[in-house]
C-alpha cells in the first residue's frame, strides 16, 4: 500500500513535467513557423520598371511596387489565361497561356511568360519567354532568355531581340542575340542571326546568314 501511495504521490509531478515538455514543443513549433513566415516576408525579388526600365528590389510576395527611380506604379500580378484574351497586360508578374488560351492584338509586358496555347501579338519580357505551341507572333519580341521547345512551331514577323536563346523546335524569324544562341538537335531555324556566341548540336539545321558580333 505504501508503494502505491508513493507512486500516486509522484503522478502529479510526472504529469506536470509532461505538460511542460508538451508546452515547450508547441512553443518551439510556433517559433519555427513564425521564423519561416518572416523569412518568406523578407525574401526579395528583382523588378524592372515598366516605365524607365530601372531595376529595383521588392518583396517576393508583393502584388505591386513603386519604382525607386521614377516612382511609377508596377503591378506584380500573375495571369493564367484559359480562353480568348485581347485586353492589355502590363505586369512584372508571370503570364501563362494555357492550351485552350489565346492572346491576340496586344503586346504582353511581363516578367516570365509560358505559352502553351496561341499567341498572335508582341512580347516584352524582363525574364524568360518559353514557347511550347504553334504560334505566329506578329509584334515585337524582346526578353532576357528565349526558350523554344521541341514541340513548338513558331514564326516571328519581326526581329527577335534577346540576351540568350535555346531553340529545339521549328522557328522562322531573324534573331539578334547579345549572348549565346543554342540550336539543339531537333532545331530548325530559318532566318538570319546576329549573335555573340553560338552552339549548334548535331542534327540541328539553320538556313540563313550568321553574323558573329563581339
Identify the meaning behind each predicted range.
Residues 48-60:
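Short Cys/His-rich zinc-binding micro-motifs
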Residues 44, 62, 69-214:
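Extended beta-solenoid/beta-helix repeat architectures
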Residues 35-38, 53, 105, 157:
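Residues at structural and domain junctions
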Residues 49-52, 65-70:
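Short cysteine-rich clusters marking metal-coordination/redox-active sites
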Residues 1-45:
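A broadly conserved sequence feature marking short terminus-proximal activation segments
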Amino acid at each position: 500500500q505504501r508503494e502505491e501511495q508513493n507512486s500516486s504521490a509522484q503522478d502529479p509531478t510526472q504529469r506536470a513535467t509532461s505538460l511542460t515538455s508538451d508546452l515547450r514543443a508547441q512553443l518551439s513549433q510556433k517559433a519555427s513557423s513564425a521564423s519561416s513566415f518572416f523569412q518568406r516576408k523578407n525574401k526579395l525579388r528583382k523588378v524592372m520598371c515598366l516605365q524607365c526600365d530601372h531595376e529595383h528590389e521588392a518583396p517576393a510576395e508583393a502584388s505591386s511596387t513603386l519604382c525607386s527611380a521614377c516612382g511609377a506604379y508596377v503591378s506584380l500580378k500573375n495571369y493564367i489565361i484559359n480562353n480568348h484574351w485581347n485586353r492589355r497586360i502590363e505586369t512584372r508578374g508571370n503570364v501563362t497561356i494555357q492550351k485552350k488560351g489565346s492572346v491576340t492584338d496586344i503586346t504582353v509586358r511581363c516578367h516570365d511568360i509560358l505559352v502553351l496555347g496561341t499567341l498572335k501579338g508582341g512580347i516584352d519580357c524582363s525574364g524568360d519567354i518559353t514557347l511550347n505551341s504553334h504560334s505566329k507572333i506578329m509584334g515585337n519580341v524582346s526578353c532576357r532568355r528565349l526558350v523554344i521547345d521541341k514541340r513548338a512551331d513558331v514564326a516571328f514577323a519581326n526581329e527577335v531581340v534577346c540576351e540568350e536563346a535555346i531553340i529545339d523546335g521549328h522557328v522562322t524569324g531573324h534573331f539578334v542575340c547579345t549572348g549565346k544562341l543554342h540550336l539543339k538537335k531537333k532545331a530548325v531555324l530559318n532566318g538570319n542571326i546576329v549573335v555573340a556566341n553560338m552552339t549548334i548540336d548535331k542534327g540541328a539545321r539553320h538556313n540563313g546568314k550568321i553574323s558573329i558580333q563581339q
